[in-house]
Amino acid sequence: MSSLKIHALADVQSKNIGEGTQVWQFAIILEGAQIGKNCNINCHTFIENSVKIGDRVTVKSGVFIWDGIEIANDVFLGPN
C-alpha cells in the first residue's frame, strides 16, 4: 500500500514521487519532475519538468519551481 497522498484537485503528471509525500489541491507537477520521499507540496504550487527535489522537502503555497532547479534534502521553501 502506497503512503503517497495526492489531493483529487492536484494535477500530477509525474510518476517520480517518493513514498510518504503529500501533494495538496491545485498543485501542478509536470511529467519529468522528480520528488523525493516524505515531502510536503502545498496548494497552488507549480513544479516544472526537469526539477529534482530531495527527501523531506516542504514547498509552501504559491511557490513556483522552474526547469533546471535542484533542491537538496531537508529544505523548506516558503513564498515571497
Language-model features, listed with the residues they occupy:
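Structural signal for interior beta-strand "rungs" in well-ordered beta-sheet cores
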Residues: 4-78
